[in-house]
Amino acid sequence: MNSDLALLRLLQLASPGLPVGGFTYSQGLEWAVEAGWVRGVDSFAGWQREQVHDTLACLDWPVLARLYHACQAKDAEAFGHWSRFLLANRETAELRLEEQQRGAALARLLDGWQLGQAPAWRASLELTQLGGMAWLAAHWAIPLRQLALGHGFAWLEGAVMAGVKLVPFGQQAAQTLLRDLGADLPAALDQALALGDDQLGGGLPLLAIASSRHETQYTRLFRS
């Protein structure tokens, strides 16, 4: 696949229009706002920046890299291992359910394209969204670094759009947040890709608490 087409495929994978339901989740932000932990643009930026460095760089991106390499090597066993590892590191029932629902939605998209149908791969593809993204990126010859940055920006954009509704703040502030927080992504990715297998894993106690409390929050805009 030529580089122009690979770029277009990456934009498709990173698009908020990808039918995986990402816009329906707040990943604990809704409770954090209600609890007063996130009160404005500055505290929102701090909330997201911690996730970039402690979750995205220490868990999601390193696992994405291993899933991608497993796809390139046609190693379904390793792909399944890292898919289960990622799911096990989602710290709450809500976060695990979100991961599985996103993964199942992307797997259905693959079904529609008659891709990823081999039994050795199909069950693992349903477990996580990152698994489907890695599989398609390897299939479409999207370079790993571009895949990771596209995924990171899509995640960040979803969080900022949730912040617009919940904190709230306006579109000017939203674009400034995307500009400023997005500038952290390349260095965080360098850190992520340098980690060994025994260094993987990250957790934020307040995020886990917020997600757990969101499961029973009385009034919610976002899915649990």
UniProtKB/Swiss-Prot annotation:
Statement: the UniProt record of this protein carries the keyword Secreted: no
**Gene3D superfamilies, from UniProt?**
Urease accessory protein UreF (1.10.4190.10)
Q: What GO terms are given for molecular function?
A: nickel cation binding
Alphabetical UniProt keywords:
Chaperone, Cytoplasm, Nickel insertion
Q: What is one Pfam family matched by this protein?
A: UreF
Places the protein is found? Cytoplasm
The entry's cellular-component GO terms read: cytoplasm
- Note the InterPro entries from the entry: UreF, UreF_sf
Family that this chain belongs to: Belongs to the UreF family.
Q: How does it assemble?
A: UreD, UreF and UreG form a complex that acts as a GTP-hydrolysis-dependent molecular chaperone, activating the urease apoprotein by helping to assemble the nickel containing metallocenter of UreC. The UreE protein probably delivers the nickel.
- What the protein does? Required for maturation of urease via the functional incorporation of the urease nickel metallocenter.
Q: By its UniProt entry, which PANTHER family does this protein fall under?
A: UREASE ACCESSORY PROTEIN F (PTHR33620:SF1)
Give the protein's recorded name. Answer: Urease accessory protein UreF
Annotated source species: Pseudomonas putida (strain ATCC 47054 / DSM 6125 / CFBP 8728 / NCIMB 11950 / KT2440)
